[in-house]
Curated annotation (Swiss-Prot):
This is Redox-sensing transcriptional repressor Rex. Homodimer. Its main location: cytoplasm. One of its GO terms (biological process) is response to redox state. NCBIfam families: PRK05472.1-3, PRK05472.1-5, PRK05472.2-3, PRK05472.2-4, PRK05472.2-5. SUPFAM superfamilies: NAD(P)-binding Rossmann-fold domains, Winged helix' DNA-binding domain.
Length: 208
């Protein structure tokens, strides 16, 4: 397998496959076909087969795919056995909602801390997550070996905060602002613009 050849679209589908395969495994299913995955995930069967082909000849004609083998493969690829330390920067409405969502209690992400400038929030514990002053980012991130940051600050602060995170050694940033931020080549950015996602959904509805 050559990770450099895996498309971004395929990479984003891998967690969906992993979750679906986990559910099938829990139900005692030994095998699954691309047609079944199409029905369960609403992903075209040809796309499923193409995605899986990145990892070699995983299936057999007339049999399908071995659920446990796929599950072990994606568990390794997605590093499910290794939890990444995550920090949320900006504990406004969205940041607070992400903390309360508690996704850090499952999967391979663990929210260790949050940062904000609001004195009413700084120094509090939000759903077991301590909130620190944003000026402590560099020291806290280094000390706690934070690898990933979720950015939910105002657009005007996005680049400044990103620079602090990069200086602290952050390797990945999930950017919920609409600002296009600059980072070094060795830092991965994943932009999440909810307004664009909504526009894409409405467009897709019109095509049906």
């Amino acid at each position: 397998m050559d990770d450099n050849k895996i498309s971004l679209a395929t990479t984003r589908r891998l967690p969906l496959y992993y979750r679906c395969l986990s559910e099938l495994n829990e139900k005692g299913e030994d095998k699954v076909s691309s047609a079944v995955l199409e029905r369960l995930l609403k992903i075209d069967a040809a796309t499923v087969r193409r995605d899986f082909s990145y990892f070699g000849q995983m299936g057999r004609r007339g049999y399908g795919y071995d659920v446990k083998i796929l599950l072990e493969l994606f568990n390794d690829v997605l590093k499910q056995d290794t939890a990444a330390n995550v920090a949320i920067v900006g504990v406004g409405n969205l940041g607070h909602a992400l903390i309360n969502f508690k996704f850090h209690k499952t999967g391979n992400a663990r929210i260790k801390m949050a940062f904000d400038v609001n004195p009413e929030v700084v120094g509090t514990i939000q759903s077991e997550v301590p909130v620190y002053d944003i000026n402590e980012i560099k020291q806290r991130v280094r000390d706690e070996k934070i690898e990933v940051a979720i950015l939910t600050v105002p657009n005007s602060q996005a680049q400044r905060v990103t620079d602090l995170l990069v200086e602290a050694g952050i390797k990945g940033i999930m950017n919920f602002t609409t600002e296009i931020i600059d980072v070094p080549y060795n830092v991965t950015i994943h932009d999440v613009d909810l307004s664009l996602e909504l526009q894409a959904l409405i467009y897709s509805m019109d095509q049906d």
